[in-house]
């Protein structure tokens, strides 16, 4: 059995995926997770294919499999919240496109908080939003990350995520 071990690494405008691979290799990792921009805002740079291809070569040379790499969605999205719903769906569609451009098939997402809403309504928003995001037949799987359950966070248990 081969262990797959990694951590969060950076992804900056200059070195992009190549820099992420280099950082993971410095840690001795064979996988990693990253944000395609700062997790607290919507600023995203243009993905440069030539850097991505260099990253692929470095990954191949070091036995890092692309299917094990994960993008983490930014914290500013909240599919639960009616007021942030449209923004969140649109921004996550862009993140899915960025994943596809990088060849990455997994996007991790915090479901969000139900601020001022019934929990069932918030969960229905998550389901509706995910269906809208994934309706284009893309190859990216959205992975819901469990939450600590503090305050109005949704997704504190597997039962809640499997709603």
Can you describe what each PLM-predicted range is?
Residues 78-163:
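Active-site acidic/histidine proton-transfer and metal-coordination neighborhood
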Residues 1-73, 78-97:
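N-terminal pre-domain/capping segments
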